[in-house]
Amino acid sequence: MKLKYKVILIINFVTVLFSIFTFIGYLNNLIGFRVVTISLCITIAMTVYLLYKKRKGFLLVYLIYLFLTNFGVFVTNIFLANPLVEYHGDLSWYYINTSNLFSIATFAILTFTILSNFISVFSKINPSRKFDIKSKGNNLFYYTGILFIIGFTIQFLFYIITGRLAINTYGDYVSSIQELPMYTYGIFFFSIGIAFAFSNVKKTHIKYLVIILTPQVLFFLITGNRGEVFYPILSALGVLIVRNYKIKWWMIITIVFTLFFVIPFIKVFRNMDSSSIEKVDINWFSSLVEIGYTLRPLGYVTRWIDGGESIVYGKSYLAPIQNIFSYIIPGLQPVNYEMVGYGFRYRLPGMGFNVIAEAYYNGAIVGVLIVMVLLVLLLWKFTNFKSFEMLSMGTAIVSVLINNIRNAFSFVPAYILIIIVIVIILLFIDSYLKKETKAD
């Protein structure tokens, strides 16, 4: 073992241990939240570096997004007494229950971080060498991915040109997509396309994928709909790391600049008139708090539980599976989400949801522990697939799981089932084409 790697492991171990002790101190009212937050930030940074070196790309990207979506507000709170200064309306979900929210979010992220470190250090299984980015994967999966990307881009432009999709403001955009059910499926296939393409692309061809993706990414950023960019791009970044693609410093700087300056500028510029351009005021924390606002559903869930509502012991995870089987098993009734406590989109309309909040609603802190453990094991398993075809499937599922960070679980089983069906169909086609080629 090289000396540099040993030093990294020691530093990483110390930061994890320090975060655990500071968190215990916080729970016993001995340490303030700022110390815990700073400690956790350092631990996350060291863990991300270790995961990158060990090519655990799926764990890496999931951890980053889990942290940003649940700790963006707390990180801002280190510097600002009121991190929600740009927000109005009912903010009691945060201010009344800040300590409880902080404890739950810290426990979840620290659990994920500790397990990721443990697997990275002690696991003897590493990504297959044949996945190296210098090699090209399955051609059928690669070109199917490109087809899905181009297909959704055409659909997106068609909706805009025909006036069915409004892009004047983010509010208009959200309202118009409610009337376009096929748009949601288009986005889903777009994310599958990105997963398939980057799982099988050769290093010298990455630039062509970037060219194909750039128009669509710009359209999403202009409309203010960043989610459709983050989920698939993060999964693509994850699989590139698994495939030993080297991330350059200029790439990291570009991402940070885009996140903290370009996107906030677009948001401000799109909501102002030409006479007030000189009054543009971009706050460094705007994007961080907006991403971290995903914490809000957890605030409501803890209020429900503290108010006497019972935890549901996994029912919200079983409900979508029951709904799938209700189509094929006579007499099995689908779950009516409007009639149950875990119909989150009806209880908190337009709010999205939160993976930690749903885990807490199902099993309190034990539920959070179980979900974090399962996620780490799943993401680790996807990293260790041995064929490009399975890696493609794993990357597509990772995109769904990243999407789930800011949404309820209800869509996840159906999306995973669709991905599996697509992969099976492509495997049959690929097998047939190879047989035909041999016959010729």
UniProtKB/Swiss-Prot annotation:
Species lineage: Bacteria, Bacillati, Bacillota, Bacilli, Bacillales
Keyword Hydrolase on entry: no
Protein role: Required for the biosynthesis of type 1 capsular polysaccharide.
Location in the cell: Cell membrane
Protein's UniProt keywords contain Translocase: no
Record organism: Staphylococcus aureus
GO biological processes: capsule polysaccharide biosynthetic process
Pfam families, alphabetized: O-ag_pol_Wzy
Membrane topology: Multi-pass membrane protein
Alphabetized InterPro entries for the sequence: O-ag_pol_Wzy
A single GO cellular-component term on record: plasma membrane
Transmembrane segments: 7-27, 31-51, 60-80, 102-122, 141-161, 179-199, 204-224, 249-269, 324-344, 360-380, 382-402, 409-429
Pathway(s) it belongs to: Capsule biogenesis; capsule polysaccharide biosynthesis
Keywords, alphabetical: Capsule biogenesis/degradation, Cell membrane, Exopolysaccharide synthesis, Membrane, Transmembrane, Transmembrane helix
Protein name: Protein CapE
